[in-house]
């Protein structure tokens, strides 16, 4: 396992961020903090890229300019998207739409590689946070990290692959937690 300071890649992340339209109804500023989400995603991508044991397309390891769309929405909106793209007439917690695959071609130097889009229902996230007795912040991190792994080619077609993916999400959230502690103490993550 690599330490946080080894093999650092300087990632330039273009985050196309769409905040939750009803943010004023929820007493939480975390999910509308674009800078925080950019930081979280960069830490997670950096960890995946520099560790050869984890699934990550070679193209993602080879470029430093990456772009992700992140949108927070409500159950009604995500249900429409879920119906359109997955033929499921129900809200879901997170949807991801990967753009790259193993055959993708690297963009020209200093151009961004589009990874895809992550869409999260804040309403479903709040319900799941309540059910699991943890914060909305933690649930949103869980869902966004799950969506990111799908953008990087992870999938859960069976229980074993789901367990692996969920275990890796735990690692990403722990790395994120450790980085936030380091920053709060004035240390470089």
Curated annotation (Swiss-Prot):
One of its GO terms (molecular function) is metalloendopeptidase activity. Zn(2+) binds at residues 146, 150, 156. GO terms for biological process: rRNA processing. Its cofactor is Zn(2+). Its EC number is 3.1.-.-. PROSITE patterns: UPF0054. Its main location: cytoplasm. Keywords: Cytoplasm, Endonuclease, Hydrolase, Metal-binding, Nuclease, Ribosome biogenesis, rRNA processing, Zinc. Pfam families: YbeY. It is an enzyme of class 3 (hydrolase). One of its GO terms (cellular component) is cytoplasm. It is found in: Cytoplasm. Gene3D superfamilies: Metalloproteases ('zincins'), catalytic domain. Binds 1 zinc ion. HAMAP family: Endoribonucl_YbeY. PANTHER family: ENDORIBONUCLEASE YBEY, CHLOROPLASTIC. Single strand-specific metallo-endoribonuclease involved in late-stage 70S ribosome quality control and in maturation of the 3' terminus of the 16S rRNA. Belongs to the endoribonuclease YbeY family. This is Endoribonuclease YbeY. The gene is ybeY.
